[in-house]
Amino acid sequence: MLTGVGNERTILVYRGASEELKKENIPWDNLQTKWLYIAPLSGELCHVFEDIIDFAVKNKIRIALNPGACQLALPEKVLRRAISKVDILLLNQEEASILTKISYTKEKEIFKRLDEICPGVVIMTKGEKGVTISDGRYLYRVDGVKTKFVDKTGAGDAFGSGFVSGFIQSSGNIEFGIQLAFGNALSCLTKLGAKNGLLKKGEKFVKVKITKEACAQNGLCKCKIC
């Protein structure tokens, strides 16, 4: 890990054997769950991406997807076909811009396009500027939360896992998912390393202010379930 000015960091990773995992290496029969959280895949696993999505759909497993550079570089038809089957899509600004081919400064246009591509909940994180989320009926926003931090490592993953966990625990309550996501991410920021600050079950956490607007209002996003 290389650290720079202002606690910014670059992480150099050697994935080893995980780069070589192929379809035949996955114990499909053991994947018995209600949800799959598909994080960025690389190496040979990137070629198994569609198989994982199709397996989940066939077995009525819900999907949370946080695609990485490898998935976003797949042919557009392949990527869109996969995303059309997911329940929660998590992206940062740059990833959302790559996927939609729209500048991340044009938030309305990005969400209209993302809501066309994905039938589920779409999340776009904006770093220190907060997050915007659409469920096709409402657009939820949280402005950046000022906090003292020790280390940013893992904060994005803490946000994503926190949201999905809260969404599952609350049977699909977006606002609870947002609160748990921010609570987990902000807690992660207070400790060194990616895991040391993660919330434990029942632990209290900081609440944030959520702004909620109807998608039909001012063309904020594409109305999927109005």
Label every model-predicted segment.
Residues 15-18, 68-70, 94-95, 145-148:
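Short, acidic/turn-prone active-site loops that include or flank metal/cofactor-
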Residues 31, 77, 84-85, 117, ...:
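Structured loop/turn residues at beta-strand edges in well-structured enzyme cores
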Residues 12, 99, 188:
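Residues that scaffold the ATP/ADP-binding catalytic core of kinase and kinase-like folds
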Residues 8-11, 35, 62, 88, ...:
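Structural motif
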Residues 1-38, 204-215, 219-226:
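Conserved N-terminal subdomain of the carbohydrate kinase-like
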Residues 35-109, 129-131:
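Conserved beta-alpha-beta core of the PfkB/ribokinase-like small-molecule kinase fold
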Residues 26, 79, 149:
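Acidic, amphipathic alpha-helical patches
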Residues 72, 104-226:
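Conserved phosphate-binding/catalytic region of the ribokinase-like
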